[in-house]
Amino acid sequence: MDYFGPHIFGYLIALLHFLGLIAAIHAVLTVRTAQGAIAWALSLLFMPYLTLIPYLVFGRSTFDAYIQARRQANVEMHKAINELNWRPWVEEALTARASKAYASLRAMPKLGRMPCLANNQVRLLVNGDATFEAIFNAIRRSHKAVLIQFFIIHDDDLGRRLQRLLLEKAAEGVSIHLLYDRIGSHSLPASYVQTLRDAGVQVHAFATRSGWLNRFQVNFRNHRKIVVVDGMLGFVGGHNVGDEYLGKKPPLAPWRDTHVQVSGPVVACLQESFAEDWFWAARELPPLILPDTYPDDGVLCQLLASGPADAYETCSLFFVEAIHAATERVWITSPYFIPDEAVFAALRLAVLRDVDVRILLPARPDHRIVYAASSLYAFEAVRAGVRVFRYQPGFLHQKVVLIDNEISAIGSANLDNRSFRLNFEVMLLTVDDDFATEVEHMLEADFAKAREIAKEESRQTHRLQQLGMRVARLISPIL
């Protein structure tokens, strides 16, 4: 023991470096981006005592167990679908393909796993009051089934309003299925969930529970926000369930966010997306409901669900294709701006094509490191000719894309690596001049309350701030 004692720290350091080597090899083999693989490999090789635990938490970017679960869910869903009247849905897909507007989507229908469908009705919901009033009213009118999925649910005033409403509808015999993300809703008390379960509400948490190492994972979060009522009415967007989304929690108040209400055949795609996630959490299917007929007119919509289990990097490619499709303008709003090389190159090329490229970001940070990295990318974008704005009144959380005068997308995906490759996201694409005009007017009102970043601002930034932003960018592949 006298010999062993003085050398124990040497043995521990050697062991850590050995484990760091193993982890570095794993990073090279599994991390999706070259930047991320290099960043992890170098840090694990040279500083394993600082990076091994963060790698367990943030590092892995594959989720094989989910792929298998999704395939199994798809088989089960096809069995259920065969028992439904699915013909109107097929007809709507054929109608969409025959329309002139379909061509404007370019590669989107092939990129997403869902078809583009005609004859939908959409309604823009600006901010939390309008969003939750519409959602709660729809749930109150439900008769058959309600599917609810949020990244965050808080046990606060808004969360308890939702709980009371679900208890009321469950008592009436409505089938309620509630899915929340275990990490996003980490503060949700067990008593909140148990009260719902005792009343007959089906509640499950989405969690990466496959394997011992996944117990440490915070990647692969389910960031989707979906509500479907009786298979007829759907909601998707950026809001979660919490008082802050109603603008009731300074210093980020007032909270700026956007949702969209949709009815028509694309609601079937919302149900399918929910069913895949529900099957992963519960190993069973929720009720899938389709109406016998749909309206004879409406707008083209496509649901784009993305996640780390996809064969392609669907979310990143969506932004690339959207930017490349623009001939007149591309306006994007996001709380975070950490683009990968492909997205940033697409933005620069759009500027060279004389496209009006604008990005709207929050002026107030909710995550300091992410804000620092976003600021550096914002300065670089401004130097490339992109117009970047900071929304002043409060925190901007909406995720909206407007392409030219026809295509808009609203959903949960941020303009960052976590949405591109690590989270499960959903966006609703709408092809319609009138709805695009509504989105345009909404964004123009937001730009009117924003301050445009000038080119000289990056040079006026203090050197310590510049250093902090560059350090933040080094770890941006894992933010």
Curated annotation (Swiss-Prot):
Q: Which EC number(s) does UniProt give?
A: 2.7.8.-
| Xref: Pfam families | PLDc_2 (PF13091), PLDc_N (PF13396)
How this chain sits in the membrane, per its record, is: Multi-pass membrane protein
Extract the NCBIfam families matched here: bac_cardiolipin (TIGR04265)
Q: Which family does it belong to?
A: Belongs to the phospholipase D family. Cardiolipin synthase subfamily. ClsA sub-subfamily.
Lineage, highest ranks first: Bacteria, Pseudomonadati, Pseudomonadota, Gammaproteobacteria, Pseudomonadales
InterPro entries, per database record:
Cardiolipin_synthase, CL_synthase_A, CLS_N, PLD-like_dom, PLipase_D/transphosphatidylase
- Protein name according to UniProt: Cardiolipin synthase A
Identify which residues the record assigns to the active site: 223, 225, 230, 397, 399, 404
Species of origin reads Pseudomonas fluorescens (strain ATCC BAA-477 / NRRL B-23932 / Pf-5)
| GO CC term (a single one) | plasma membrane
UniProt keywords (A-Z) are: Cell inner membrane, Cell membrane, Lipid biosynthesis, Lipid metabolism, Membrane, Phospholipid biosynthesis, Phospholipid metabolism, Repeat, Transferase, Transmembrane, Transmembrane helix
An example GO biological process term is: cardiolipin biosynthetic process
Name all PLD phosphodiesterase domain ranges: 218-245, 392-419
Task: Give this protein's Gene Ontology molecular function annotations.
Answer: cardiolipin synthase activity
Q: Which reaction does it catalyse?
A: 2 a 1,2-diacyl-sn-glycero-3-phospho-(1'-sn-glycerol) = a cardiolipin + glycerol
Q: Where in the cell is it found?
A: Cell inner membrane
**What residues form the membrane-spanning segments?**
8-28, 38-58
Q: What does this protein do?
A: Catalyzes the reversible phosphatidyl group transfer from one phosphatidylglycerol molecule to another to form cardiolipin (CL) (diphosphatidylglycerol) and glycerol.
What's the gene? clsA
> Which HAMAP family does this chain map to?
Cardiolipin_synth_ClsA (MF_00190)
